[in-house]
Amino acid sequence: MEERQKDILKLLYEKGRVSVADLARTLYVSEMTVRRDLAEMEKGGYCKRYRGGAVLKPRDGEMPVSERYFMNTEEKKELASRASQFLADGQTLFLDSSSTCGYLLPYIARHKGIALVTNSVKTLLSAAEAHIPCVLVGGEYYEQDMCLVGSLAEESVRALNVDLAFFTTAAYDEKTGVISDFDLRQTSIRKLVLHNAAKSVFLFESYKLGKRMLHTLCRKEDATAVLICKGDTQ
């Protein structure tokens, strides 16, 4: 996928719907170029075209983690930097399968005696490259998020006790304090980990604020900290 198409995908993910005219103005290209990009993206299963624009094609509600990892990188880096204040030597950590939490790995690598647990295959591979000891929970492989979910994964995390868990979900409503997601399987895993974690930290990029998804994970008061981009620890 070309960089311009990644930009279009980012806008689709943030807005859900885009027009050819708006994309042409935003990206400084012709409408013909935008239409060609949208046609290629539709073939790839990323969007559904309509007259004058396109909508995000539901893929369990979200783009693959391999694509999300490179979206909003500055916000992800900012959140990871701020979240690193909670790290200490000798901790047992859990990282969920979100792309944002993956940005914590360079900070985790600086600490000694860390034991890392995750349901993310991508996190496992990145941790191995950074020489961070890592345990991958078992379960059913969910390709889009490169993670393990389902009853086996739930049984695995139910027996775990961790010092600190890091999460990112699809939505955080600042007014109500509700933290939610569209994916029931991921929400189930996170609920079990949250229950057994001594501390928990949530990280949210700016575009996830003020939203609510179908499945409630918890509320703000259930977390040790909720970090939002360009805001203070809450």
Predicted regions and their residues:
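HTH-adjacent hinge/linker in prokaryotic transcriptional regulators
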Residues: 2-21, 25-26, 32-97, 105-113, ...
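Conserved phosphate- and dinucleotide-binding cores of soluble alpha/beta proteins
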Residues: 10, 17-21, 124-234
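Short beta-strand scaffold positions
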Residues: 95-96, 118, 228
